[in-house]
Amino acid sequence: MRWSFLTVLLWLVSLTGAENGFNGWLRYAPVQCDKRCQRALPSSIVTLNSTDSGPIGTASQELQAGLENIVGKQLSIKRSSCGSRSSILVATLEQYRQACNRSSEVPSLGIDGFWLRAYGDTVQIVGENERGALYGAFEYLSLLAQGNFSHVDYTTSAHAPVRWVNQWDNMDGSIERGYAGPSIFFEDGHIVEDLSRVKQYARLLASIRINGVIVNNVNANATLLTSQNMDGLARIANVFRPYGIQIGISLNFASPDTLGGLGTYDPLDPSVISWWANITDSLYDRVPDMAGYLVKASSEGQPGPDTYNRTLAEGANVFAKALQPHGGILMFRTFVYDHHINESIWTNDRANAQVDFFKELDGQFEDNIKYGPIDFQVREPVSPLFANLYKTNMAIELQVTQEYLGQQDHLVYLSPLWKELLDFDLRVDHQPSLVRDIVSGQRFDRQLGGWAAVVNVGTNTTWLGSHLAMSNLYAYGRLAWSPTDDSQGILQDWIRLTFGRDQNVLDAITDMSMASWPAYENYTGNLGIQTLTDILYTHYGPNPASQDNNGWGQWTRADHDTIGMDRTVKNGTGNAGQYPAEIAQVYEDLDSTPDDLLLWFHHVPYTHRLHSGKTVIQHFYDAHYDGAETAHRFLSQWESLKGRIDQQRYNEVLSRLVYQAGHSLVWRDAINNFYWNMSGISDEKNRLGHHPWRVEAESMTLDGYEPYTVSPFETASNYKAVVTTSNSTTGTAQTKLQFPSGTYDLGVNYYDMYGGKSEWTVYVNDRVVGQWEGNSENTLGHTPSIYIDGHSATRITFRGVEIENGDQLKIVGVPDGVEPAPLDYVVLLPPDVVD
């Protein structure tokens, strides 16, 4: 069902005090509802044969709190018959049929589904199970919170039974690829005592119809299976259970050896089989409704069955068989590849690994067992594995945490990316084979299928480190329930719930978010070349050279004349041939391959002309300039909302967008300069290397500063920066400004390294224009860098600075720790200039 929004003659109450994001989209902010309005709403909540500890009890509490906050009406909670007047009735389908004797009027309900009927003061919320009833309660509150008091009568059910989120939380409290603070589950090797944040996380997840959460990292630590920690898992499960959410855990394949002391972890060894069965029994004794296991094996250094020459199916089935008596599910990751492959062999290709490893094992996995071939890139084709496993239950893995996509310091709304994948038709056996229908189990008539998303919330009050990034978690839940929903419609529901119903706010955030994925793709990696980030270090800033000359397999094969991976059957790695015939034909042919995947499937000259008529290299140059300009537009769009959003969230989002605008220029210049240097082909528009408004730091008069050759070279404006001569020496860089007199935005590009908090002051004629501290490790969430590079490169801008031709500009840098107060350049920007 597509959720709709009907305009009514109600409007939000004026903005209240500051908000910190903790409530996410469950703010239940007040809407205007006078006494007449309140009288037209229910007066009580009726639950049938339920207890307070289950999801229906939770639903009644949510409804009571929600109605009081949204419309100011207090509702009592009763356990009575279905005939109560002026009430919200909450029940399971079975309870409703037994108590109300109205079987004929109840629509059929599918997996976790619900029926919502609301006519004024009479509301019925009937779930296929208690979980479904809770989902219906959240749905009703969502409508009210958006000002929708209209009559509704509809049913909706889940697209697939498995709708999980994964946390890559480590036992020490850190989170792998997490950008929002420490774990809410673990610290110092144990489960935390205070689980209050876990309860709020459960509320958020249940409201978007998530039914399972894996609480620990796929690169798992066997110590999670100690008796003390299994007791802690039971406490976590007790918090999630009232919200209809089951917990599961990731396992380390070698645990029978490293924790159990068996001296082996061979999945066919009887002692190993017995060990896993006993561990599983112990877990289910503590958590009877545990969802199951997630296993990463034989990949990226993780142990697996290949150590004993066992197949991946044999490795998976030792867990699946241990789970079967308890009804648990094993999710076995297909993210399996050799990260030591030799790039000099033309036919080697990491993208082939999933099909190579798993296709021949189809049908050998027990029944209770990544969307792209590489690793959550800004653009990848759909994994061909979806078209090659007919007899195996499958789920799709997405990433809410933005590992390769700006790490929540760049606005990137991901629903359009996901929708493009889900709507893709693989044409298996020349029949309609949409990815969304494959993962649901519908296409190949499988009983089990679904979704998993790596989320990685932390202790930051915004959950993901950024207010706007929460749109991705919300969208994931909505799509996992109903993948035909519209990305913009999902987004606008989230905006109204999170920021209110001001049309200006709705329009601005909608435009920004819908433009954000194309913008990020434009200023990072284009035409299917991947994200061009540093794959060997932080996965954050630009470093295109890191893609090649290593065994990780994310190669671009770029040289002086050509670029791209040849994945054709005719002349390349054969990856195109892993797709069904109709799709393989498209990708095999250079002319029919879509431009946005050209370099994924083909190795071509930089001068190759796209369907647009541009050459590959000119498309690179233009796209990177376009993307950076779009990122700067986000900033002005957000600033137009000042006074329409509470001050705290306005300022926190503004800070991220200011940073994104500056870092988009780092990306733009780095990628363009790298390929200009490699190819020797100039930009037709003569923009590269032409920066008339910049003053390079190394060209200024230096005292206590010295030039420094930056690596990678392209992450500095003129390939150089300046650093203090020692970590105890204050540096000064000054110059006479040769610009027309006027008002400028004065920007300073510098490097904010991890391990120090340098301080800078900028003067114009001894007048202080601005001061700042290099403390981004405290204010931003991305993985920091200890180097002067594209990860630490950033910009600060002081607006409206009056400059006279001939003024003296001076910057004083005070180093701290390992950070030598590094500077790249100064830029004086006239109005409407982006550089």
Swiss-Prot record:
The enzyme's E.C. designation: 3.2.1.139
Glycoprotein recorded as keyword: yes
Any Pfam family hit: Glyco_hydro_67C
Entry's Gene Ontology BP terms: xylan catabolic process
Signal peptide from the UniProt entry: 1-18
Main location: secreted
InterPro entries according to UniProt: A-glucoronidase_C_sf, Glyco_hydro_67_aGlcAse, Glyco_hydro_67_aGlcAse_N, Glyco_hydro_67_C, Glyco_hydro_67_cat, Glycoside_hydrolase_SF, Hex-like_dom2
Catalytic activity: an alpha-D-glucuronoside + H2O = D-glucuronate + an alcohol
GO cellular component: extracellular region
GO MF annotations in UniProt: alpha-glucuronidase activity
Compartments in which it is found: Secreted
Keyword vocabulary terms for this entry: Carbohydrate metabolism, Glycoprotein, Glycosidase, Hydrolase, Polysaccharide degradation, Secreted, Signal, Xylan degradation
SUPFAM superfamilies per UniProt: (Trans)glycosidases, beta-N-acetylhexosaminidase-like domain
Residues with glycosylation annotation: 49, 101, 148, 221, 278, 309, 342, 460, 522, 571, 677, 727
Family: Belongs to the glycosyl hydrolase 67 family.
Function statement: Alpha-glucuronidase involved in the hydrolysis of xylan, a major structural heterogeneous polysaccharide found in plant biomass representing the second most abundant polysaccharide in the biosphere, after cellulose. Releases 4-O-methylglucuronic acid from xylan.
Protein name: Probable alpha-glucuronidase A
